Amino acid sequence: IRDIGVTGVQTCALPIFTTNTTWTSNNTYLLQGQIYVKNGATLTIQPGTVIQGDKTVAGSGLFICQGSKIVANGTINQPIVFTSNQAPGSRALGDWGGVILMGKSNLNVAGGIGNIEGLAVSPDTQFGGGANPDTMDNSGILRYVRIEFPGYVYQPNKEINGLTLGAVGKGTTIDYIQVSFSNDDAYEWFGGTVDCRHLVSYRNLDDDFDTDNGFSGKVQFCLGVRDPQIADNPTVSTSEGFESDNDATGSAALPQTKAIFSNVTWIGPLRGTCPAAQGAIAAGFRRGARLRRNTALKIHNSILMDGMRGLHIDGTAAEGNATSGKLKFQNNIIAGFLNNYSLERNAGSTFNIWSFFTTNNNDSVSCSANILTLPYGTGGNYLNPDFRPVVGSLALSNSSFNDATLAAFTIQAPSTTATINYCQGATSM
């Protein structure tokens, strides 16, 4: 690190950290290029520290290599903020790369080892435990961390996301994270076993929660909020709330993608109380949840509302997993989708998606007016939103934690009067 001549600002001039390092809150740190923490080093970041990605250096980002750790343990009043180095008001999606953690847990690719897409194949970009994965691998702590204006596209379908988790193990702590204005996904898991809680995805481009390559962690308490004008290019990709694949070809590779999500609220682009678009909607929006390519994802106790389409179980392999009970969608609410388009199956499919939906205690309503209090904020401008259920909401009575897969989850009774709001004040422009 060297002083760049601005009081309180330091830049990461060297691309590699191989010894334990601490970044302090009295400095602002500038990431110029791809910064790697490797050789077992630990990067500690104090609460309240600001780290900026340099827009002028392509794909600037922070990479925590296998065997190394990040300890970014912020607080609700002193979050750690990763953001663009552009002036407030001039920041944009994709100004810099993002935060990437690479672990040694499960990965269902050949040999059990992969590399971060878009980058040169090397030990620095490698993740996965190979033939002997460590499901309890520890890549450190991310707690009360904001990641703003990330998401670098190297080429179509080869991007780094706001937070990329490659085969990250269950010994890692991921809690109270917000990704905003990413130029790709907010969160993407490539394999791994890490459990995550309190994840916010705010006005990102592509998918909010993307799971691939055998991810099997438990994820609870999530919020996704979409901007009607921010969606992917539909000739390249479509924007989903959930997108889940076993792998890119839908193979039977093991371990299978079987992550469990509970208590997720996803608010789509329609911004309305009934299933009709409120103004122009970007062409790339598609579904609240697209479960495809042999995934066995499980979604419980969640709300999908105000989108173009609701749940799509895409392809015969995913349909078979739904029939067998490996793929689950239980005790959820789908509300306010365009033209009441709550459920989708592929052309020619004989899968009875309606029966699957109703027998698993899910509800579908055409209007979302009586679900949440003020999901789009005052006047629909995202200021001071209130995501609590309204009195009489289906969300107050539709949850259940009786399924065996939810045994380790926190049982949280829905409330109209809860006072804890970990999102408050957590968005910067």
Which residue ranges define each predicted feature?
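Single conserved hydrophobic/aromatic residue that forms the stacking wall/gate
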Residues: 1-12
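Glycine-rich loop(s) and the adjacent beta-strand/alpha-helix scaffold that form part
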Residues: 78-79
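Extracellular beta-rich repeat passengers
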Residues: 13-43, 54-67, 74, 83-184, ...
